Amino acid sequence: MGDSGSRRSTLVSRLPIFRRSISRKHDSLPSSPSSSNTVGVHSSSPSSTNSSSGSTGKRRSLFRTPSISFHHKKGSEPKQEPTNQNLSISNGAQPGQSSMQKLSLEEHTKARGRHSVGFSSSRNKKITRSLTEDFEREKEHSTNKNVFINCLSSGKSEGDDSGFTEEQTRRSVKQSTKKLLTKSFSSHYKLSKPVPQSQSISLVQQSEFSLEITQYQEREPVLVRGSPSCSVDVTERAGSSLQSPLLSADLTTAQTPSEFLALTEDSVSETDAFPKSGSMASHCDNLGHNDSTSQISPNPAAVTKTTRDLRGTVPCAIVSPGKYRLEGRCSTESNSLPETSAAYQKEVLLQITKLPVMNGSDSETHPSTDTREDHIVIQNGETMLATSSPRKFGFYEHHKAIAERVKGIHPISDSRIIPSSGDHHVLNKTSYGYDANPAKVLASSLSPYREGRFIERRLRSSSEGTAGSSRMILKPKDGNVEEVNSLRKQRASSSSSKMNSMDVLNNLGSCELDEDDLMLDLEFLEEQNLHPSVCREDSYHSVVSCAAVVLTPMEPTVEMKKREELKFREPSKQNLSLKLAKDIDQEARCSHIRGVPSSPSSDWPLPSVEENGGIDSLPFRLMLQDCTAVKTLLLKMKRVLQESADMSPASSTTSLPVSPLAEEPLPFKDIMKDECSMLKLQLKEKDELISQLQEELEKVQHLQKAFASRVDKSTQTELLGYDALWNPTCTEGLFKPVHNIST
């Protein structure tokens, strides 16, 4: 691990991005101090985050999301040097120092480039020409650029992302460290004196690649302008010991410009760090940015450091109350990348050796270096940020106990706890929390809630795909357990409620439907008469009936039980929430009754997400909608089956519930009556026709008898009468009416 760390450190110090971005600084810095309050605002290079370094087309194609420009509020505290804000992200495969040195003073002030992020925070500081002269004075040789370009074009394997051979050892680490030190301290030569190089080099020569958190004495509050090196020198002092987390095994990791994480693993975590110590408000307005702006409070009793959230796979930001050691509680291993960083998955105990503390005379001679105690420790591709602040030493035990408790509760994995120092408990506020002290709240413009809540999200790169999960870890402090639980429940209801509701519905697929499943289970409702106030609510009726529909056909061996739990603020207002257990052997699939305000906009308290390893509980409204949809589909299915049964008389509908739609005796009787009445009418008409025909036939027969008698009397012969009957000419007028009637 030591060899690979040294190779990475050497590669970090020799990136060609450093050289080109430094030369870009010289051109863009002003030649004379600007006037008014708008000084320090300069346009940035359009290709500040994806400048070319050889063949970087692959890295340029990684930026797919538009850039987001973040600005501080104008009414906030006075801002310090824009060099405090020099940690942004470079190309997707570049290490942390490239982002530190590449994005310079003017590239942070205002964003005009495609992927650059600007800040309008330096409104009261003039940038003199001496800074540009210091930048030009500290140009490094072009041989380092050629070394890195050759390493890029040599086509190393992804397993060895350093690009250097085994021959380069800690000697090159020390050399590059010295170069970075001279370069970093030159940028603030006029404002603060550099720390001796022996002290700075000792920061990176520890065998554990760890840094010392030095606690200087509290200075006089004379620093309105502060030191511009507060975020430059420390990270560059840590330069060679940084084990190049950006050059991970997966070089195709897309670094999202809208998030701007400083570390690029396959999945990187970003954390809102909330350091609050002294009367100084550490103010970072960007969740994904590694920019820190040291703010001077209205009563500047002390100037403390602002933290830069260098996000690795698992970052930790700790506000140190004094000189102490970062234990392994917050040390991380990249568990989320077993395929790329398997060699680094050992718990690293960052043991920090103590450096000599500056005495009182040094404190007097270095009044502007009060904000330099910000050291970045990068171990195995992860970042740990420690911010020291002039507070009481007694808080050390408190933080150490919190770190140990964090390790016990939450094992070291993808998520980490970020404990905050002091007595500030604004971090534990939920989304409905309040801003207790505006000067001491570090809010994030990217986070959904700006009230001091810190979350940890995993960004999924293009190589990782969809195999990622978002975590939210909260540290309860000062007894704010209920608010933490409420925030955790909000996360559970927002991220996994839809999936869980679909899981509940999918469990109904292979189950047979009974009569009780298709109807409202009123008996289940009658058993709840112990709660008369709840029974009066229509929503409770519908939820109980829907719960019976959803939970009954799950497993024949699992029984559904109901039990009463604690009533909270108002016992008359209660809520039903369902928890579907994951284990079939467990006999309890319960419907928990919890008292909450009945307003639909309020937070519905849900059971703990990690409880019993079960499915996350459904929110009340979402569960109600899903159950209503299921019940509607079942009723439609019932009607379809009834219609099909009506078409085939042989099929029986006894398995279906008895309802007016199932029997339908009246429509059949009506149809038969109609048919009978029609038949009777037809029969009557036919009878009338028959009677009419009979009457006409009788008339015809009577006429024939009368004619025959006259013929007999006249002729006295029967032959004439016989011929007259069959002769149409003689009998035409006599037989014609009879013929028409018969037809």
From Swiss-Prot:
Signal peptide positions on this chain: none
UniProt xrefs under InterPro entries: CCSER (IPR029627)
The protein, known as: Serine-rich coiled-coil domain-containing protein 1
Coiled-coil region list: 672-713
Organism annotation: Bos taurus
Gene from which the chain derives: CCSER1
Keyword hit for Glycoprotein: no
Membrane-spanning residues: none
Assigned protein family: Belongs to the CCSER family.
Keywords from the named record: Coiled coil
Biased composition (Low complexity): 29-56
Taxonomy of the source species: Eukaryota, Metazoa, Chordata, Craniata, Vertebrata
Keyword Electron transport among UniProt keywords: no
Stretches the record annotates as Disordered: 1-125, 156-175
Superkingdom field: Eukaryota
Record field: compositional bias (Polar residues): 81-102
PANTHER family: SERINE-RICH COILED-COIL DOMAIN-CONTAINING PROTEIN 1, SERINE-RICH COILED-COIL DOMAIN-CONTAINING PROTEIN 2-RELATED
